[in-house]
């Protein structure tokens, strides 16, 4: 039951982040991007500047390498840049502290992220 609840909370958090980001960025495309294996939970594409930002949304409070595995997958990055322009940001939105890793991946606290949209 705990795993199911965690799954539901994770999906709800994804939906809230996606919806609020869409509302805050009416001139940009905001969507999930599916691949044969895996997905980016959110892409914010700026067609006017041919750039995009890619995100993973996690319900966890902890940082873990598997959370950003898609954000460092060269094939996914190449395909995304081909379709939506240069990737300017790779971020994991989660419930822990803000941090930037050595590989450039950013961790953003979900509450801070949502407040920044206002």
Model segments located where?
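A cross-kingdom feature that marks ATP-driven nucleic-acid transaction machinery
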Residues: 1-118
């Amino acid at each position: 039951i705990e795993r199911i609840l965690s799954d539901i909370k994770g999906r709800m958090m994804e939906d809230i982040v996606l919806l609020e980001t869409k509302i805050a960025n009416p001139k940009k495309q905001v969507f999930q991007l599916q691949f044969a294996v895996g997905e980016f939970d959110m892409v914010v594409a700026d067609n006017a500047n041919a750039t995009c930002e890619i995100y993973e949304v996690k319900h966890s409070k902890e940082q873990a390498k598997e959370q950003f595995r898609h954000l460092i997958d060269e094939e996914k990055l190449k395909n995304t840049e081909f379709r939506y322009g240069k990737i300017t940001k790779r971020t994991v939105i989660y419930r822990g502290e803000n941090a930037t890793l050595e590989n450039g991946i950013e961790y953003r606290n979900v509450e801070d992220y949502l407040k920044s949209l206002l």
